[in-house]
């Protein structure tokens, strides 16, 4: 948007992707960005991809809902649906993980409030990821659980290479390839 008369743009963002060694700790992704053309907007999101049964899913979603409601009562349901639709692998007919929120083109009449929301998304990710890591980091795993993790990570890689807008944007605009592909899991397996 906003490039019809002038194709130049400015973009900045923060992306964090965690692919823990432990198959009990889900892969976690956080991204926020600000883009400026003749228009300006924020985007971003949080999603997690457990490999094994995950007993905190309900708490995760209710906490995200609570955070979103501080800014706009419609954000959670709207952004959760966007996340579920976005992180879907059509060739596998499955979701990449258990979702979260995903938003783009956030530009209300209050830039400061929009920025506060983006900051809250970052704070939520920081606090939630520490909670999960500290809760599960000592839990042991076996070879079968590690194998399940590697298979689940193959879905993560497939999504990023085939469908991710950020990956495509970075590759199409001549970005740093190593930085663009940093979100890939370090190991994955296909059967």
Tell what function each PLM region has.
Residues 1-191:
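A domain-level signal for the structural core that forms small-molecule/cofactor-binding pockets
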């Amino acid at each position: 948007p906003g490039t019809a008369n002038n194709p130049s743009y400015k973009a900045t963002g923060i992306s964090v992707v965690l692919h823990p060694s432990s198959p009990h700790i889900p892969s976690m992704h956080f991204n926020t960005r600000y883009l400026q053309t003749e228009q300006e907007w924020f985007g971003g999101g949080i999603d997690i991809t457990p490999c094994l049964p995950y007993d905190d899913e309900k708490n995760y979603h209710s906490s995200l809902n609570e955070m979103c409601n501080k800014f706009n009562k419609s954000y959670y349901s709207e952004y959760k649906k966007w996340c579920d639709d976005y992180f879907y692998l059509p060739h596998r007919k499955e979701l990449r993980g258990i979702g979260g929120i995903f938003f783009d083109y956030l530009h209300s009449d209050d830039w400061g409030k929009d920025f506060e929301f983006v900051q809250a998304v970052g704070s939520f990710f920081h606090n939630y990821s520490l909670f999960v890591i500290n809760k599960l980091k000592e839990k042991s795993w076996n070879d079968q659980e590690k194998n399940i993790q590697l298979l689940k990570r193959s879905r993560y890689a497939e999504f990023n290479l085939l469908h991710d807008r950020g990956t495509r944007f970075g590759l199409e605009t001549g970005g740093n390839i190593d930085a663009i592909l940093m979100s890939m899991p370090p190991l994955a397996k296909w059967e």
